[in-house]
Amino acid sequence: MYSKELGINFFGNESNKKRQLNKIEILKKNIKNLKIFLIIAGTNTSQIPGISAAGINAKSRRKTALADAEFLLEGASKDHKYKLPLLNAGVTPALISHVCSKLINIYPVIVPLGIGAKPYFNHLDVEDRNLGPSNCLTTGKSMTKERVLNLYEKGLAIGKSLQQPVLISESVPGGTTTAQAVMEAFGLQVSNLVGSSLFKAPRELRRKVVKRGLFNANFKANFDSFDVVAAVGDPFQAFSMGLLIGARLAKQPVILSGGSQMLAIILLVLEFLDEKHKDEFIEDVFIATTGWLVKDNSLNDLVNLINEKYDVKLLGLASPLNFKSSKYKELRDYELGHVKEGVGAGGISLLAFLDGFKNEEIVSLCQLNLEMMKDLGQISLEKDC
């Protein structure tokens, strides 16, 4: 029904049409009552040359998450503090998320972790900002286990306190690489399936980075999810794991808006949960992403790997948003495979479609905001910003 009318694609466990429609109804019913979290996090894995398109170089990638969060909240503004880093192609997905969150009239909550700066805009503090980004995963010592457990407990407490459905999104430069490391730590061979913000995923580079990190981690017998995040993960994973479990304990549906980084969270939780609770846990958990990320089917394969390993029925939904008709190259670049996802673009745009907004309306507003960004000098023109 809705999937055919709106062009929503399902992926993962698609066996039950009634279940698909029920998922759509749950989302549609809860649009106006959602709590959206954008977790912006720092990992020094992002400083590896060529690892991420979230900024044209290592220096710019340090500011990407702050600039994304600012734009998500404020949109194009002459009073912006953070310039959006120049990308080789495309434009920040925060543009999509800003436009669509305004359309559905939801104000996101920003959670900064390991950013090393106190944002001037409204945000939720959960740890000492002086802790800074997690170490590069190649060290095998990304964070202390104490920090991981503290972030998990903070996320758990916040999740359990919620009385409304939750959407979790992220801006974590280098995060797909830490996601791959987490999944491979638990035995999933995913190096050819994990996506990238880059047009051509740096698979060989990531393979080497992950291999080195896992070697240096030197896991002992009976290691758990917290051990893995401490060794090769990032702050986003530790906090989001708690937030997801807490929200489900509060019986709230949860939308994980993204790709492989969200699947890494699912995997960490499934490894942690008692076997008998897995089906109930996964029933009202949604993966929502952009159509650009599911084009080559690798995300579908990744979801099915997790479904098979843990004997669950995780279902994904892909937003029908497209920029084929856009007059701007930066937006049409998405159709060529650049950027693809981030800052909750897939999940938040999906909600806008379910709320009745049309593709041409969203494209028009994205174009308008892009014009304003350029006019206000909000995108850096320097390759080193």
Swiss-Prot record:
First and last residue of the signal peptide: none
Domain of life: Bacteria
Pfam family, one: DBI_PRT
One function term, GO molecular function aspect: nicotinate-nucleotide-dimethylbenzimidazole phosphoribosyltransferase activity
HAMAP family: UPF0284
Family assignment from sequence similarity: Belongs to the UPF0284 family.
Protein name: UPF0284 protein A9601_04941
Lineage start: Bacteria, Bacillati, Cyanobacteriota, Cyanophyceae, Synechococcales
